[in-house]
Design a protein with these regions (language model features):
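An acidic/polar, Gly/Ser/Thr-rich interaction patch typically located in mid-to-C-terminal regions
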Residues: 44-80, 259-307
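Short beta-strand-centered interaction patches in the first periplasmic/extracellular domains
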Residues: 121, 128-130, 174-287, 292, ...
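N-terminal export/assembly leaders
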Residues: 151-190
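Extracytoplasmic/secreted envelope proteins and their assembly/folding machinery
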Residues: 148-152, 197-200
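Second-shell loop/turn segments in exported
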Residues: 135-145, 185-191
Length: 307
């Protein structure tokens, strides 16, 4: 097992690259590729982040897009497309292990970095569709039932973050895979004009995972996490995530290896590490680090329970 892990860890990398970055105008459907002018491409996804993000910096010489009705007149992408925000960006990249990532993101911010008489360098901050839609939607309806059902409704219902029109499919958007772990407890609430992401993160703190044998689920729970990856949207309990088998064994021992393989029983060796051990009791108490409880009250029948 250790030999196979070591062999997999040291697979020879191959060439990586950006295959496609196409921007589509919101105004007239005009499309332009910036793949040849791209200087920097950064893609971010994290288990602690609600949405995926990317940053693209490209150089524009000013002869990129046709200007107006004159086919012989060209101008910069910023002016000719034009870039005003929320443009659709279809991206395809490939890493050193030949893993291809295809995604559709949207322009969240346009930052002109430098500009002179010869060229313009522009940075685009991109975000997923759900990140943009979250700022447009407010939840005012009442929700009854299990917390996992509430999460599913917020992510799939057309009134909230779900796909709305077939026109989005023409832009390259595809409905994302929704990976939701069932919860044991129920919770009824009213949206109170909150954003979907706010409600999802709020509900995740009180969610209790459903036990496989169905024998409970109202005990101590560390809560749930909500995050997005290139593969979809995920809502998983911390207990389930930490209960999995290790995906990677890492060793840090401050000593050089006699050969190129990691030590027996480990997959890789860490070059350096740092520890964050800032202790703030007041802040931890505010967040409920040492004691949490869920109070359930039904005003119609005066039912009261502390979980």
């Amino acid at each position: 097992t250790g030999a196979r892990a070591a062999e997999a860890s040291y697979t020879e990398g191959k060439g990586s690259g950006i295959e496609k970055i196409d921007i589509t105008s919101n105004k007239n459907g005009k499309q332009v590729s910036i793949v040849n002018g791209t200087m920097v491409f950064l893609y971010y996804e994290s288990i602690l982040q609600d949405a995926t993000h990317a940053v693209v910096s490209y150089s524009d010489s000013g002869n990129s897009v046709g200007s107006g009705d004159n086919p012989k007149k060209f101008t910069s992408i910023t002016e000719g497309l034009p870039l005003v925000g929320q443009e659709t960006v279809n991206i395809k990249v490939q890493d050193n292990n030949q893993n291809a990532l295809e995604m559709t993101l949207y322009v969240n911010k346009v930052n002109p970095l430098t500009e002179d008489t010869r060229k313009q360098v522009v940075q685009l901050q991109l975000a997923s569709r759900e990140f943009i839609m979250n700022e447009k939607v407010r939840v005012n309806t009442r929700f009854d039932g299990k917390i996992s059902d509430h999460i599913k409704k917020l992510l799939e219902d057309k009134k909230y973050l779900g796909p709305t029109e077939k026109s989005e499919e023409k832009e390259g958007f595809k409905a994302k895979k929704i990976d939701i772990e069932p919860t044991e407890n129920t919770y009824n609430f009213v949206g109170n004009n909150k954003k979907p992401y706010y409600l999802i993160n709020w509900l995740s703190r009180g969610a209790v995972p459903k036990l496989p044998e169905g024998g409970g689920g109202t005990g101590i729970s560390a809560g749930f996490l909500f995050w997005e990856t290139n593969k979809g949207l995920h809502f998983k309990s911390i207990d389930t995530l930490l209960g999995q088998n290790p995906k990677l064994s890492v060793l840090y021992n401050e000593s050089p290896d006699e050969n190129e393989l990691p030590p027996e029983g480990y997959d890789v060796k860490a070059l350096e590490y740092s520890v964050s051990n800032a202790v703030d009791i007041q802040q931890k108490l505010k967040l409920g680090a040492y004691s949490t409880r869920l109070i359930v009250f039904n005003p119609f029948n005066t039912f009261y329970e502390v979980i």
